[in-house]
């Protein structure tokens, strides 16, 4: 078992070194928040980029840029200061199952939040304790908070899942990785300081799940919260303080299809 862990560790470290470079950014949805410098712009652009992240990455990036254009490329200012008439431009916006109703609710929730809060981080951390092992309660709180406004549309709930419903929460875990992790390559932002890297849970992308099974990090095939925790624990055996950094390695190799 120790030999297997050692071999897997060497493979993951090698893959991480290969893919953890600024060139990773260009063709990934994380390129969307990288267009901005203001913290709140990064948060809003990052949230939409993460939520839109299923399917072809080029399409995801194009749709994100379309949305940013409708927000005059100033998402924080738009969210904060828009008027009802400004929302008409979104009536034809759609990305797969994410439709106008969903978008308008997102904008409404974000406007409500930023009226009272400096950062979107608090929407997660208000549900957490500093000694929590992971972000499970933060994600559950974010879900409840996101749909606490009157007349919140039921259909939008599928875009903000929660661990309590056994969702792997892939997109939100990816968003948290972007906001929390800080390291030298400049891929992730590290602008949130009240959630620690060791509390993050690995985003369970289809490529990540496949490669994790090939490397025998996990054996299960089902993509749910339990599996996400199992994979994260396996990665903690390799790097207990920053396990989710290996998401970049697993995803990068899975997408590239190249040999180790």
Model-derived features: positions:
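HhH-family (HhH-GPD) DNA N-glycosylase catalytic core used in base-excision repair
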Residues: 1-260
